[in-house]
Amino acid sequence: MRSVLSLALLAVNVVTAAVVAPFDYSGYKVIRVPTQKDNVKEVQRIITDLNLDTWKYPKSEGQNADIVVPPSQISSFMERISGMNIEMMHEDLGLSIRNETSFEAYSAGYAPDINWFKSYHSYQDHLSYLQDLQGLFRTRSEYVDAGKSHEGRTIPALHIWGSGGKNSKPAIIFHGTIHAREWITTMVTEYMAWSFLSQYNKNADITSIVDNFDIWIFPIVNPDGFAFTQTSNRLWRKNRQPNPNARCPGRDLNRNYPYQWVGPGSSSNPCSDTYRGAQPGDGTEIKVHIANMKKIAANKGIAMFVDWHSYGQLFMSPYGYSCTARPPTDARHQELSRIFAQALKAVHGTPYKTGPICNTIYQVNGDSVDYALEVLKVKLSLTAELRDTGARGFVLPADQIIPSGEETLAGTVAMLKAVIQG
């Protein structure tokens, strides 16, 4: 994956890796080509022949190809796709990124409110925000340094509880930003944390949820990759862990979990965005997260795990590794997915598709959802692809943060109410 963007004022917690020169995406275009039976093979050939990056690769007919085209290839690309339908996602990707990354300044000690969600923020400001937010609700929450990334950055978490007290109820675990470029997931998981804390004893549904569950929110599962997207490469996906005897760093952390690790839903190529790692669970951050989940499970168990991603507007259930196998709890997973999608749509009209991961988006090996369900024995394990469906993709404008948070919270509240009701 190519690199992008420098934010001169970004503070980085720890710097142990070599500085990578930022790349300017000015003039790059992101173009969607819908595929069908008569053009999917040709679209695949064009991507290969021109050595183009993709945000979405069309593995079969009917899937969209979201293609990043550099200025030097635009003429050749447009000639090759002549006669095909296309949609322009970003006319100038560099301009879109500059608009997205106009971070609002944050002063530590500020009383967090809705204004935080009007902008994206630096990694260091996220740490300050989470500590400030927790500081307003000290009697029923804690800020946790859950462990360190490969480069030594803090993996932050908020732990929230209700009337029963700390560690007295089955846990809910939310993960965000396991894929570094999916910035909207950082903001949406923080929006839910803010809502669970600030609306407790004000909103009956939220109060019931917080009283019935021990809530753990990890907004930045992959801090090294996240920081890297803000200094060098806006479209970076993996962590930043070096790979022995390979020029390409990083593991796809959501292909590194030690369950059904090998298969067509991951790659053995260190330069692939879906590189599974050298061994199951060898990602530094995965070791941290597995240790945390096991520790949480040892209290009252884990009632639900949700791994938040973008983009695609999907809410999905196990399995990722197989398109034919189904867990015994499949019917319940499907029911809760529909409840989530219906309640979410009622807020802003945003449609979500639901279904098993492998059948709904693509096959995935070594993913968090399958691992949580089958190894940790989490009762309900789910994943989401947040806004949008491709109009802006990974570079989602900041004015969509609040509506994304509002609708995702509504879907989550409806789903958890259904879990409480049994």
From Swiss-Prot:
A GO MF label: zinc ion binding
Q: Which PROSITE patterns match?
A: CARBOXYPEPT_ZN_1, PEPTIDASE_M14
Q: Which cofactor does it need?
A: Zn(2+)
State whether keyword Signal applies.
yes
Q: Which GO CC annotations does the UniProt entry carry?
A: extracellular region
Cleavable signal peptide:
1-17
Q: Which residues form a coiled coil?
A: none
Query: Which positions are cleaved off as the propeptide during maturation?
Result: 18-112
Q: Which UniProt keywords apply?
A: Carboxypeptidase, Disulfide bond, Hydrolase, Metal-binding, Metalloprotease, Protease, Secreted, Signal, Virulence, Zinc, Zymogen
- Which GO terms fall under biological process for this protein? proteolysis
The listed locations are: Secreted
According to its UniProt entry, the function of this protein is described as: Extracellular metalloprotease that contributes to pathogenicity.
Q: What is the name attached to this protein's record?
A: Probable metallocarboxypeptidase A
Taxonomic lineage? Eukaryota, Fungi, Dikarya, Ascomycota, Pezizomycotina
